[in-house]
Amino acid sequence: MENAHTKTVEEVLGHFGVNESTGLSLEQVKKLKERWGSNELPAEEGKTLLELVIEQFEDLLVRILLLAACISFVLAWFEEGEETITAFVEPFVILLILVANAIVGVWQERNAENAIEALKEYEPEMGKVYRQDRKSVQRIKAKDIVPGDIVEIAVGDKVPADIRLTSIKSTTLRVDQSILTGESVSVIKHTDPVPDPRAVNQDKKNMLFSGTNIAAGKAMGVVVATGVNTEIGKIRDEMVATEQERTPLQQKLDEFGEQLSKVISLICIAVWIINIGHFNDPVHGGSWIRGAIYYFKIAVALAVAAIPEGLPAVITTCLALGTRRMAKKNAIVRSLPSVETLGCTSVICSDKTGTLTTNQMSVCRMFILDRVEGDSCSLNEFTITGSTYAPIGEVHKDDKPVKCHQYDGLVELATICALCNDSALDYNEAKGVYEKVGEATETALTCLVEKMNVFDTELKGLSKIERANACNSVIKQLMKKEFTLEFSRDRKSMSVYCTPNKPSRTSMSKMFVKGAPEGVIDRCTHIRVGSTKVPMTPGVKQKVMSVIREWGSGSDTLRCLALATHDNPLRREEMNLEDSANFIKYETNLTFVGCVGMLDPPRIEVASSVKLCRQAGIRVIMITGDNKGTAVAICRRIGIFGQDEDVTSKAFTGREFDELSPSAQRDACLNARCFARVEPSHKSKIVEFLQSFDEITAMTGDGVNDAPALKKSEIGIAMGSGTAVAKTASEMVLADDNFSTIVAAVEEGRAIYNNMKQFIRYLISSNVGEVVCIFLTAALGFPEALIPVQLLWVNLVTDGLPATALGFNPPDLDIMNKPPRNPKEPLISGWLFFRYLAIGCYVGAATVGAAAWWFIAADGGPRVSFYQLSHFLQCKDDNPDFEGVDCAIFESPYPMTMALSVLVTIEMCNALNSLSENQSLLRMPPWENIWLVGSICLSMSLHFLILYVEPLPLIFQITPLNLTQWLMVLKISLPVILMDETLKFVARNYLEPAILE
């Protein structure tokens, strides 16, 4: 039923044709069940294991590698002679890499549990309904409830469907609907129509929502929505419809993969075409087909050379190490790619309650009357320190600590706070914190009594458990609570009837009252000044109310409670406690004692974190279910707004936002820093608008209501104390629920991206070198300098270790003074592309040069001419151009070993170059990252291993080198450091200043 909250009880019952006392007939139930289905959320069909595996092979680079492996396998099958076994090594290794990558990918996807499944934990098992087949209430499975059912709910129940209240069977009905609306305190419900068809869920005070909990009271209602039509069902549908966006890094790597695959294809075709003239060379036995296959193998080698096989593994390792560092800072990352996304966060949309604030209501101000003369009066105003439930804090007057027992008014105020109260403090030994037992507002008063210590109780030597309620216990020993007049909407107050534990002539029974100031003060005839009682004049009342109004607005927006007593109440037997309508009569002729102002205080460290965000170019937006006044006040306190800043067009309620045109809504999201009284749909809409500006949005949330927005935003951040749904829909969980942890995680994300950029560039320059090497050998007609199995070894192992170690580079000192990077910024810009192309060309030329040196100039080499080397395929005993040359020399393992050793050594030098993008090695020496030094040593050790330990040289088709050859390797390799230092010098002195200008 649409807009059931706007209809009267009679209209709703009439719509379903149901009587409140008898319920639906079984015939009606059957029809309604057929129409609306079961009252449960359908499970989402997940992807099958096969679908997940196939998905892992949708990446272009992976497909090229797969193709290369298949071709290598087919070619190896037709290989003859000694090389048959080694020919199978290459396709086997490629397949091994692909399988390992696929396993990691599938595991990660399976690990991101389904948030939609977690929603099911909010579905109650059973419900209590009235139906015509039985005279009394019956318990049935919640999934069998249908729209139109008459349901009974009582304290402790989980609401089984969306229900329009028809009657309340207790003085009040309080509902904890925080999981759905984010409201920090339980909500009092009523049965009157709410005439606004566009009311947000918080304002539908006559509705109960599926999955919420009854905190107090008992009521009846008619079911108006079940299953996916409930508010929680709508959240489920929204989550199903939300497609997970790929992270900026994933998009970059996708683009890079596409570009690389095109370049690889072109180069492979070019190499093959260049050598068409050599297809008939004698070495191929004059067979054109065998020649074509030989050059096809070289093209496959090129593909293997061009793809950085180690990149996925290195990225995963770097992100995993980043998550460990973040976990130490209380940020638990659930999705690895999001670690890097944090680095380009440009907007943080934060919940107020519990994230920016402590979610621990705390009294920060109070006043009692000091002096009254006619219509004029003066107040004693006090401030209270401490912003958590810990009973630690001081009471200050004029910024100086005071002893509360010196003020009679404060003694009475503390007595009311302690007795007119059903809450307590509890010390949680496991967590080492004080927690509330009961309502947040009442716990704030309990905590205030402990801080005031009006009877000067000796607190030293008490354990933390004993300390929790020590001062309250003293007051409760003096007077006994006989009964409570529960809170009701009409009088906006509650009271307790107390009698002294030691009756005497002077001590009489009293009623202590607390409630909304306007309601309580209207019923006060007197006012307490010290220990005396003075009539309340209109002037005094006006003065008191003006102070309360000032506290309730202004910079604090405190929640104020008036405290009063009834010194001569009726006796218990004279009161009718069955009818709550009479309670207001018993709470008249009151004496006003004082007022307390409380708020959910901002976390101490949040203001500095907001300032840090501003320096880092990150906009912080507060999004809350609370009212606008409170939200703006907290924004001012933590620095989201300046103290006197005009918040017009910067702060909106959900209603104000809805009333704007779509273009005005878009503009609002461009400037706004505060949204109050919002619903889940608003959060998702705000995220959509921000994404349309290419903002990278981090969204926090803890309730079921936050899940769609958490899933939609680039970075969903759930609270450690939040619901399972929020956690499973998010990328990150804050173990300490603290906003400052987000800022620390953003800083870590920026550092990780910078390091990632370094090692991606490092790996790519290595691949450019390998491609140039193979292209040069093919273009010059030289024998192969590097074969695929060697390239795989270099790409995976030798380069992989230093690349991983580059992930440990220390972050730049000014990392949080720069604006967020543009997610569209390419991994490799124009200048850097030139730089890595230049380095890559040197690597390729040096590798080919090392092989050529052994053929042409080495002492132990054949010393052939350049012509002979470049036409080696024409080498035959009867060819006069090759007189005196043993043709078998062109298959010697030495040139390959020289080429591989130069490639590995240059790559180690390159790793040192990658310590910093533009800083010289003199400014940033290798020991700045000791992991890098260790990984270079390990990589070189592994290279020696394949050179000198049998049977590895046979597999890699290489052979041990002597000292002269090693010296030549170093001479060819070391200039790469000088070359990169020159390029860095140009960047530092000529390019960076130009960019900054």
Swiss-Prot record:
GO cellular component, one term: sarcoplasmic reticulum membrane
Alphabetical list of NCBIfam families matching this protein: ATPase-IIA1_Ca, ATPase_P-type
Residue intervals passing through the bilayer: 49-69, 90-110, 254-273, 296-313, 757-776, 787-807, 828-850, 897-916, 930-948, 964-984
Post-translational modifications reported in the UniProt record: Nitrated under oxidative stress. Nitration on the two tyrosine residues inhibits catalytic activity.
This protein's record includes keyword S-adenosyl-L-methionine: no
UniProt catalytic activity: Ca(2+)(in) + ATP + H2O = Ca(2+)(out) + ADP + phosphate + H(+)
Protein's name in the database: Sarcoplasmic/endoplasmic reticulum calcium ATPase 2
Name of the gene this protein is made from: ATP2A2
Residues binding Ca(2+) 1: V304, A305, I307, E309, N795, D799
Gene3D superfamilies, A to Z: Calcium-transporting ATPase, cytoplasmic domain N, Calcium-transporting ATPase, cytoplasmic transduction domain A, Calcium-transporting ATPase, transmembrane domain, HAD superfamily/HAD-like
Residues bearing the modification 3'-nitrotyrosine: Y294, Y295
Tissue specificity as recorded in UniProt: Isoform 1 is expressed in the heart.
Positions carrying Phosphothreonine: T441
Assigned protein family: Belongs to the cation transport ATPase (P-type) (TC 3.A.3) family. Type IIA subfamily.
InterPro entries, A to Z: ATPase_P-typ_cation-transptr_C, ATPase_P-typ_cation-transptr_N, ATPase_P-typ_cyto_dom_N, ATPase_P-typ_P_site, ATPase_P-typ_TM_dom_sf, ATPase_P-typ_transduc_dom_A_sf, HAD-like_sf, HAD_sf
Any one GO biological process: mitochondrion-endoplasmic reticulum membrane tethering
Signal peptide: none
Binding-site residues, Mg(2+): D351, T353, D702
Cofactor section: Mg(2+)
Main location: endoplasmic reticulum
Keywords noted in UniProt: ATP-binding, Calcium, Calcium transport, Disulfide bond, Endoplasmic reticulum, Ion transport, Magnesium, Membrane, Metal-binding, Nitration, Nucleotide-binding, Phosphoprotein, Sarcoplasmic reticulum, Translocase, Transmembrane, Transmembrane helix, Transport
Complex formation: Interacts with sarcolipin (SLN); the interaction inhibits ATP2A2 Ca(2+) affinity. Interacts with phospholamban (PLN); the interaction inhibits ATP2A2 Ca(2+) affinity. Interacts with myoregulin (MRLN). Interacts with ARLN and ERLN; the interactions inhibit ATP2A2 Ca(2+) affinity. Interacts with STRIT1/DWORF; the interaction results in activation of ATP2A2. Interacts with the monomeric forms of SLN, PLN, ARLN, ERLN and STRI1/DWORF. Interacts with HAX1. Interacts with S100A8 and S100A9. Interacts with SLC35G1 and STIM1. Interacts with TMEM203. Interacts with TMEM64 and PDIA3.
Places the protein is found: Endoplasmic reticulum membrane; Sarcoplasmic reticulum membrane
Entry keyword Transmembrane: yes
Disulfide bond positions: C875-C887
Phosphoserine: modified positions: S38, S531, S580, S661, S663
